[in-house]
Each structure stands twice: as C-alpha cells, then as structure tokens.
Amino acid sequence: MNKQLRQLKVREILCQHDVGNQHDLMRLLNSAGIRVAQATLSRDCNEIGVVRSRDSKGYRLVYSEKNPGWIIKGLVGVEVLSVKANETSIIIRTLPGRAHGVGSFLDELKSPMILGTIAGDDTVLVIPGSIKQISELVSYIKDNLSQNA
C-alpha cells in the first residue's frame, strides 16, 4: 500500500475510533489488512498532524483537518509548566515525558531566534540565536506555547 492511501486510512481510523496510542493504531491498521512498521507509522502520524490529547478517559491520538497547528499549540501549552531564562539560555519545564514533544514543536516553528533545542524527560533547553534577544525569545516562546506558560 502506498503512503498516501496508508495515511488516509490512519485519518479514517482516528476519526472513527478512540485510539490511545500508536500500538492500538497499528493493531487497527493490521485488522484492516494494512501491515506497517512502528517507525513508518510514527512518521505518518507526524506528517499528517496526529497529536496526543487528554480527555476524560486518558490520552488518545487525535487528528483534525481544522487548523491542526492551533490544536497542537493548545496541547503543547498544557504540557508546559514554566519558561525561565538567564543571560544565555532558556529552560522550559514540562510534565514528565513531554519535553521531547515540546522541543519538537519549537523546532518546527523554524524561528531564526532559536538556534536549537535539547530535550530531556521533563526539561527543554532552548539555545537562542542571539543572547541579545533572550527576553524577546521568552515572549515568543510563551506566545507560541500558551498564554499561561
């Protein structure tokens, strides 16, 4: 099966089923006769904008055709606990296990103000393009993550 058809099936499954994680999604794809490696499924999910959302039942994977950037921004913002800076760098504290997603989100912004990010389990180190723009970059990060970061 080609990539476009596989990604179309992923969207269809996510719109019709409550899917808690990629393993569940892979199982549903297998039931539909689609065999896919976990790494391929992960790339597909990233490319089509699948995100983890928390609802009353816990976490689930969601896909929305309606402005996925806004949805991702809101979800990532919920995961951020604080944004603090010193003279040379910015530290973002997140919920446990969520730093990688926050760092990836910031990387996808492709801002020239951000030289790069390094993510651990619950901390993201943001390296600014210029230390002269630290306060401006902190505001930019807060605006792009959430209003209350």
From Swiss-Prot:
Record carries keyword Transmembrane: no
Disulfide bonds: none
GO molecular function: arginine binding; DNA binding; DNA-binding transcription factor activity
Superkingdom field: Bacteria
Cross-referenced SUPFAM superfamilies: C-terminal domain of arginine repressor, Winged helix' DNA-binding domain
Entry's localization field: Cytoplasm
Keywords: Amino-acid biosynthesis, Arginine biosynthesis, Cytoplasm, DNA-binding, Repressor, Transcription, Transcription regulation
Pathway: Amino-acid biosynthesis; L-arginine biosynthesis [regulation]
GO cellular component terms given for this protein: cytoplasm
GO term, biological process aspect, one: L-arginine biosynthetic process
Family: Belongs to the ArgR family.
Protein task: Regulates arginine biosynthesis genes.
Classification via HAMAP family: Arg_repressor
Family matches, as PANTHER family: ARGININE REPRESSOR
Name of the protein described by the UniProt record: Arginine repressor
Organism encoding this protein: Chlorobium phaeobacteroides (strain DSM 266 / SMG 266 / 2430)
Gene name of the record: argR
